[in-house]
Amino acid sequence: MLSLAHFLVLGAILFAISIVGIFLNRKNVIVLLMAIELMLLAVNINFVAFSHYLGDLAGQVFVFFILTVAAAESAIGLAILVVLFRNLDTINVDDMDTLKG
């Protein structure tokens, strides 16, 4: 039987991997978006673990809202990325330093 500590350790490991992914790869926007989504999933695992441990469904309902917002964020982020790639021919973060109208 898995205890609360197992889920919290899993969430902490996933969160740490996402932080490392953000700090080690600052060039590719797609990898940055994936690391942010992994960070959100780590937080969701903690919400579900505490919700199950305390016997309250509020944490699980909150996870559904977070997943909905994360899906919308991913769709909008990828749409912006496609437009930037069409205009700049790159997805490198260092090349996206100009603000043109």
Swiss-Prot record:
Keywords: Cell inner membrane, Cell membrane, Membrane, NAD, Quinone, Translocase, Transmembrane, Transmembrane helix, Transport, Ubiquinone. The chain crosses the membrane at residues 4-24, 30-50, 61-81. Disulfide bonds: none annotated. It is a multi-pass membrane protein. GO terms for cellular component: NADH dehydrogenase complex; plasma membrane. It catalyses: a quinone + NADH + 5 H(+)(in) = a quinol + NAD(+) + 4 H(+)(out). GO terms for biological process: ATP synthesis coupled electron transport. It is found in: Cell inner membrane. Its main location: membrane. InterPro entries: NADH_UbQ_OxRdtase_chain4L/K, NUOK/Mnh_C1-like. One of its GO terms (molecular function) is NADH:ubiquinone reductase (non-electrogenic) activity. Its EC number is 7.1.1.-. Gene3D superfamilies: 1.10.287.3510. HAMAP family: NDH1_NuoK. Belongs to the complex I subunit 4L family. NDH-1 is composed of 14 different subunits. Subunits NuoA, H, J, K, L, M, N constitute the membrane sector of the complex. NDH-1 shuttles electrons from NADH, via FMN and iron-sulfur (Fe-S) centers, to quinones in the respiratory chain. The immediate electron acceptor for the enzyme in this species is believed to be ubiquinone. Couples the redox reaction to proton translocation (for every two electrons transferred, four hydrogen ions are translocated across the cytoplasmic membrane), and thus conserves the redox energy in a proton gradient. This is NADH-quinone oxidoreductase subunit K.
